[in-house]
Amino acid sequence: MEKFFNIKKSGKIYLQLYSQLKEKIEKEKIKGKLTPVRKFAEELEISPSTVAKAYDELERNGYVTKKEGSGVYVKFQKKKNVYLEDHMESETFRYGYFNPEFNIDFASATPNETVLPMESLKRAINFVLDRDRESAFLYEDPQGYFYLRKTICKKLKKEENIDIEVKNIQIVSGAQQGIDIISEAFLYPNDIVIVEDPTYRGARNSFKKNDCKIMEVSMQKDGFSVRELEKILKRKKIKLFYTMPNFQNPTGISMSFEKKIKLLELAEKYDFYILEDDGLSNLYFDKNKPETLKSLDKNNRVIYIKSYSKIFMPGLRLAYITIPDILLDTILARKFSSDIYHSGLNQRAFQYLLENGDWDIHMEKARNIFKEKQKIMYNSLKKIKDISLKKPKGGLCFWVKLPENVSSKAVYINMLSHGVGILPGVVFSEKKDNYIRISFAQCEEKNIEEGVKLLGCAIEKLK
């Protein structure tokens, strides 16, 4: 079997072997019993412990099963097209989240191109090419460019008072990949994951694909319902609580300081982890940035995902995860088998932007732009009768409650006929058909009032 493997004697050899075995199992090139550890090690001229570690990783991720006294066997692989399933399951795609034909786009929460710092990025890329030349295009460390991870650690210490080592930072291709990797590395079938209701569907789909049991706690004006969470914790053993504590998607709600502390206390008491998804805490409109859960975490209960690309340059797909020591190897293995590593050029350019302050300059500019857009949209929405909404202290969206007899799907269809994109509440919760999410991220300031007027007309017509 050794002729089918290309093992380089550098880097983490067991990860190379794991990745190649995984691929061959998925393509059904390997079936039945795997080659015994010692024999396989001799064939590949590597140590038996390396083969054993690769087999352990295959078992951990559900590709093989070990039979006492018999050997290691490939499990039956249920065929599925992940991308197709995502598209079919996600209301996001059904309701045209990525429709390029909207005249006024209130659906997308991605900033439009006028906000993106093109000149800063061009300078950074040119600097990196002059400094690193061919090195910028070589294979990168699967865990991420070392100096980017080092710069992230420095910023976490300076801005959040978080002490973390470089080895505990994993660079990923966007927050969604981070969620997927954590799901695959940390969660087993039938593990219980708690999510807020409503919440980001991409996270729900990720947990669902890993056959987890999903339970919900409702959102209140200051974050999740403590009473509902404690009720679950007293009767169930949960593995993970997924949350966006600052400017939550879709509600825009920020968890109160008291609830952040309470959640951390409950995680310690009931022995579960918190997955904090932070894409927007830098987009605050008050004087002070809200605290992250990770900055308050004294017992290493928070796995923190920070997305940079969301409000900087969406196409970069750049985020990082802070990883507890216990998960280091499994998360690195999942990243390696997913796409091996993130673009070295992108990582080096972004490290330069972080180091020289361009990121901070961009964020200050973005806060000013979006604060003004939020103000215009809020003042326009207040003119619509029989809806209710709160004004978030940051972020990119409003969560609007419709009149009781008006369906968000009907509003969506009506608005679509006028070339205006919104997202119906069912994208985020099956229970929220009388809510819509509208975002001011993508639309031009001059179009906000017109789009909101059309929304008001649609609601009035459907009442």
Language model: regions and residue ranges:
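Conserved glycine-rich beta-strand-loop-beta hairpin in the small C-terminal domain of fold type I
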Residues: 368-378, 388-401
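Conserved core of the PLP fold type I
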Residues: 136-270, 282-283, 288-296, 370, ...
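Helix C-cap/helix->beta junction micro-motif
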Residues: 44, 210, 236, 269-270, ...
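Conserved core segment of the aminotransferase class I/II
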Residues: 298-368
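Short beta-strand(s) of the beta-wing in winged-helix/HTH DNA-binding folds
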Residues: 65, 303, 388, 421-422
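N-terminal basic, amphipathic alpha-helical segments
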Residues: 1-126, 336-342, 403, 409-417, ...
